[in-house]
Amino acid sequence: TAIITGAGYAKLSNGRCGSIGYGIATAYAKEGANLVITGRNVKKLTDAKEELERLYGVKVVCVQADVNDSADNEAVVNNVVKQAIDTFGRIDVLINNAQASASGVPLADHTTEQFNLALYSGLYATFYYMKACYPYLKETKGAVINFASGAGLFGNYGQCAYAAAKEGIRGLTRVAATEWGKDGINVNVVCPLAWTAKLEQFRDAYPDAFKANVKMPPMGHYGNAETEIGRVCV
């Protein structure tokens, strides 16, 4: 059983899948894994559930979950974990992919609300999910896969809150790897560059920031959410 946050279905302008979370879910579904997927948008979650169950014959539980600065976040996350255990009885993998931000807004113009959006949806969500899943991952000798970003590694323009959240996730991941290794829990971080609906929107809304930040990988193409990002997680 895998819990994948931020796994709603999203389409690119050409109609292809544009969600890293859904790409990861697809890679796991092809291996026959049971899935618990979360997100803020119920329709995107429902669309993902219907597609995954129809195409791959797996069981998918979708749970609306929004970690933010005004919610009882431990209760939000504990509800997701409870539904996973009540339905499947175990958790083998936790994948923290969810992240919202006001990318493109320079640091001097960033508001507290925009900063909190990135920290709560990314860093705090990762923290709460890891804590809630820990006892179950200890039982299964499972794995945690967290998602960070080159935005923090390279100091991307207009991404101060996003970069701060992602660098916090990298630090949190390293500490968990140190502390949880004795429990047989494998903890890793991925910094992907895939062509997604969010990246497409970023390009259209902030063309200057996009040109400054997003460089073509040496392979000559952006990562495929399923075959190149999802397969790494599997």
Question: Where do the protein language model's features map onto the residues?
Answer:
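C-terminal helical subdomain
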Residues: 182, 189, 208-234
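Residue(s) in the substrate-gating loop at a strand-loop-helix junction
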Residues: 149
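Alpha-helical segment proximal to the catalytic Tyr-Lys
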Residues: 135, 178-182
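Active-site loop immediately N-terminal to the catalytic Tyr-X3-Lys motif
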Residues: 108, 154-161, 182-183, 220
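Active-site helix of classical SDR
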Residues: 130, 165, 173
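Canonical Rossmann dinucleotide-binding motif of NAD(H)/NADP(H)-dependent dehydrogenases/reductases
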Residues: 1-35
